[in-house]
A protein has these predicted regions:
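TPR/TPR-like (Sel1-like) alpha-helical repeat modules
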Residues: 182-189, 222-245
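Short helix-capping/linker turns of helical repeat alpha-solenoids
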Residues: 22-26, 40-44, 48, 59, ...
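Hydrophobic face of amphipathic alpha-helices that form TPR/SEL1-like repeat modules
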Residues: 35-36, 54-57, 89-98, 123-132, ...
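Terminal, low-structured helical/coil segments at or just beyond the last alpha-helical repeat
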Residues: 241-277
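Helix-turn-helix repeat elements of alpha-solenoid scaffolds
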Residues: 6-9, 59-72, 103-107, 139-141, ...
Length: 277
């Protein structure tokens, strides 16, 4: 990329000064622009890619408006292609991977994560792409090695529960339900330690509930499963507040599982009450 095409502080100012976005729904975005747009000099006061990163963290309960997205995309691409900022490639991947940025494109996300896969957060998301076949062909072998690397180097809760899925289902590895169970509990410990996202916690609790449903149906296992599903529902609903609308199907599935567990519990209680002949 030729240097003259990079976004300069004055060009960045003009783009953001004219940006159309929902001010009332995006108070954090408005505050960031107030802090870093110098109306007297008509330029921004920090590097564009740093401003882009701050805007990515703002107003998570609102789908990103196109003008803000386009600025972030341009600023991060400049950062990556001009100085090979590896973190810019990771953020670009996130920009196209997560729903709240309003421009999901798994192929672009996979390509950006692949450029700098040695960066921890990129590695787990690259593994997730290979696991689900997002933006690339599904490949459990590649997924496994990305997830193992992320689990060992970053202690990622996300990588741990996906590794649990691989052992639970026998994807690339031998099926091992106890190992899957241990990985899910380890993922939960890590998620609590680092205060992971609501979505990550929900995914873990959903899996713990399901793995306990595979056990003999006792009051203890069923009560644990129900508690896990209740927490999964709570965290999925929290995640939906951050514009992860595709999770509504997850919430429906969890509520069906809650109903199933309650029916098992009712049957057990009725059996206990039946007189012995």
């Amino acid at each position: 990329m030729e240097k003259e095409w990079l976004m300069t502080p004055d060009v960045a100012y003009e783009r953001l000064d004219r940006a159309i976005y929902n001010h009332s729904a995006c108070p954090e975005t408005a505050h960031i622009l107030y802090l870093y747009l110098d109306d007297e000099k008509r330029e921004i006061t920090i590097p564009p890619k740093e401003l882009a990163k701050e805007l990515m963290e703002a107003d998570k309960n609102h789908l990103m408006d196109n003008d803000i997205f386009n600025f972030i995309d341009k600023a991060l691409r400049d950062g990556y292609y001009s100085i090979k900022d590896s973190w810019a490639s990771y953020y670009l991947g996130c920009l196209y991977y997560f729903e709240r940025f309003n421009n999901v494109n798994y192929e672009k996300a996979f390509n950006y994560f692949s450029k700098e896969k040695h960066i921890g957060p990129s590695t787990v998301l690259l593994g997730e792409c290979c696991f689900y076949g997002r933006g690339t062909e599904q490949n459990y072998e590649k997924a496994f090695f990305c997830l193992i690397q992320s689990a060992l180097t970053d202690n990622s809760a996300r990588s741990l529960y996906l590794l649990g899925d691989m052992y639970l289902n026998g994807y690339y590895v031998d099926k091992d339900i106890p190992e899957a169970n241990d990985l899910y509990f380890h993922a939960l410990e890590v998620a609590d330690e680092v205060d992971s996202s609501s979505e990550t916690k929900a995914e873990i609790y959903e899996r713990l509930g399901k793995v306990y449903l595979l056990r003999p149906k006792t009051l203890e296992t069923l009560h644990f499963a129900l508690k896990a599903f209740n927490l999964a529902e709570k965290y999925y609903l929290e995640a939906m507040q951050e514009c992860m609308f595709s999770l509504k199907d997850k919430v429906k599935e969890i509520r069906d599982l809650q109903m199933e567990v309650r029916e098992y519990l009712d049957d057990l209680i009725l059996m206990d009450k039946e007189p012995v002949s």
